[in-house]
């Protein structure tokens, strides 16, 4: 089950810069840690986080095993026009999660 | 039990051991105050506190039907914002018809088995922690208020005795660290006063949410004592004692701790 | 959690090196070279914010920000963060544009040990800028039994 917390303003002035913060539940297993039987636990990370504004990509981040469990990312965006910010996380084991928030620009 | 001196033998561990706690002004410190600014900010910002992911998960479980009774928590308890407000602040408590106290996760599991007719959720399982976090979150900002039930006294006293007894290969008591040496550094880490203000906590060391029991186990392992079995009554006794010791302090669940 | 042990008395905490999987200053230099090629890197314009004392290396808040007008003509195109001692030198690489308005990224990283962190920004004119920070990581006390 997708478990995501996104923080973005519901409204923004046209042309202003807004901060978008996103937190997602994920173990970010490094692939370097030994498990119970001394066997390495297979890597299971989010590899990529992208954001779009009304479909146009505005942010793209490639992650590594050095990103902490339950990854948190904050970034900025220019509130160009009212619309939908789409957030997408993809990773190992076919992990795909999408979340959308709507920002009204006035 | 505010002894002024502690045995000189302890000097192997702490150069000078001294009871700093004093009667009078409330000088108690939540573990939050021992953390750096960055971690305090992480705890205080709901969209940055990873524990809030579990609270969100818990709110989903709250509304999900389970067991042969096919009932959700919400079916009986309604809106948790009102029905669960203040509940975490007064646990452990003795359920109706029972004789021994249960802690909050014990109480939730009672509802699982008796009211939902579902299987118990395993200790430290994600679903149990999420429900516990969701329930505890409803008491955030409220003072810890243990119930005035005289039947609890005997259990609490046993908890106090455990707290003060030396144990483990290192022959230490909880009190030696958490009363007499709180605020000092141990291998670079500040020893907190051990107030259960934030539970369940998102502990960075665990990279996940965990219960007060798990935290206590860590301290027992730290002093090389055999931790009690995962659902042993000793944990509830210790929790009763710790909650009483922290009476009036504000609940912060879900806390963030290093 | 056998890796680290809580030893009162000697106040010692043993860290078993991660062995061959460990990144090194050389591996970091190599990873940086892959990004910047032969270009010069100027230590300016980039700010790397980390807590002065890291209480647990599992989750370390980090903010990288770059001075830039963030216009179409002059903006930050990419921000990369590297480390010396985690198993791999790359921490993250992000692509930005004028649409971001502000060149700042916050995240949380894992740091297995005290080490140097480097952030590199590439601006739209193809130049590279950097900042670095030396971080000290405290290892947690009172850990789990072996899991």
Question: Where are the regions that the model predicts?
Answer:
Chain B
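Short coil/turn and helix-start
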Residues: 67-68, 168, 229
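Short cysteine/histidine-rich zinc-coordinating motifs and their immediately flanking basic loops
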Residues: 84-91, 186-192
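Conserved short C-terminal alpha-helix that flanks the catalytic cleft of nucleotide-sugar-dependent
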Residues: 62, 162-163
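N-terminal, post-signal-peptide region of Sec/Tat-exported proteins
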Residues: 46-79
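The canonical Cys-X-X-Cys-His
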Residues: 70-80, 131, 159, 170-181, ...
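Post-cleavage N-terminal segment of exported redox proteins
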Residues: 2-54, 82, 92-157, 183, ...
């Amino acid at each position: 089950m997708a478990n995501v917390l996104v923080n973005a303003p519901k409204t923004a002035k046209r042309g202003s810069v807004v901060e978008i913060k996103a937190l997602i539940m994920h173990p970010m297993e490094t692939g370097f840690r030994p498990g119970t039987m001394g066997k390495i636990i297979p890597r299971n990370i989010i590899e990529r986080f992208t954001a779009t504004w009304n479909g146009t990509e505005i942010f793209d981040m490639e992650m590594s095993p050095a990103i902490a469990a339950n990854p948190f990312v904050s970034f900025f965006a220019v509130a160009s026009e009212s619309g939908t910010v789409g957030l997408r996380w993809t990773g190992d084991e076919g992990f795909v999660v999408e979340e959308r928030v709507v920002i009204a620009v006035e | 039990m505010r002894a002024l001196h502690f045995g000189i033998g302890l000097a192997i561990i702490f150069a000078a051991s001294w009871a700093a706690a004093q009667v009078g002004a409330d000088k108690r410190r939540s573990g939050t105050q021992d953390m750096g600014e960055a971690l305090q900010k992480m705890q205080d910002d709901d969209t940055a506190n990873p524990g809030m992911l579990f609270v969100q998960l818990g709110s989903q479980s709250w509304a999900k039907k389970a067991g042969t009774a096919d009932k959700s928590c919400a079916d009986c308890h309604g809106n948790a914002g009102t029905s669960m407000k203040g509940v975490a602040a007064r646990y452990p408590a003795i359920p109706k018809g029972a004789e021994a106290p249960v802690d909050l996760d014990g109480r939730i599991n009672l509802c699982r088995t008796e009211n939902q007719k579902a299987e118990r959720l395993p200790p430290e399982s994600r679903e149990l922690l999420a429900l516990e976090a969701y329930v505890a979150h409803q008491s955030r900002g409220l003072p810890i208020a243990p119930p005035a039930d005289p039947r609890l006294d005997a259990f609490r006293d046993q908890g106090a005795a455990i707290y003060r007894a030396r144990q483990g290969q290192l022959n230490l008591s909880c009190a030696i660290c958490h009363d007499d040496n709180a605020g000092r550094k141990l291998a670079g880490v500040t020893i907190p006063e051990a107030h259960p203000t934030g539970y369940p906590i998102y502990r960075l060391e665990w990279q996940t949410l965990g219960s007060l029991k798990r935290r206590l186990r860590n301290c027992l392992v730290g002093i090389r004592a055999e931790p009690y079995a995962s659902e042993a009554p000793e944990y509830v006794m210790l929790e009763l004692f710790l909650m009483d010791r922290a009476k009036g302090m504000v609940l912060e669940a879900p806390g963030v701790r290093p | 959690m056998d890796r680290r042990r809580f030893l009162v008395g000697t106040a010692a905490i043993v860290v078993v090196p991660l062995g061959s999987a460990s990144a090194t200053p050389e591996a970091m230099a190599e990873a940086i070279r892959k990004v910047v090629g032969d270009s010069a890197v100027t230590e300016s314009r980039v700010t790397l914010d980390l807590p002065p004392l890291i209480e647990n290396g599992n989750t370390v808040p980090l903010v990288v920000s770059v001075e830039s007008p963030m216009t179409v003509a002059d903006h930050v195109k990419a921000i990369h963060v590297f480390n010396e001692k985690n198993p791999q030198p790359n921490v993250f690489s992000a692509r930005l544009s004028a649409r971001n308005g502000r060149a700042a990224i916050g995240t949380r990283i894992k740091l297995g040990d005290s080490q140097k962190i480097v952030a590199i920004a590439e601006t739209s004119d193809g130049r590279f800028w950097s900042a670095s920070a030396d971080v000290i990581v405290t290892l947690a006390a009172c850990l789990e039994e072996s899991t």
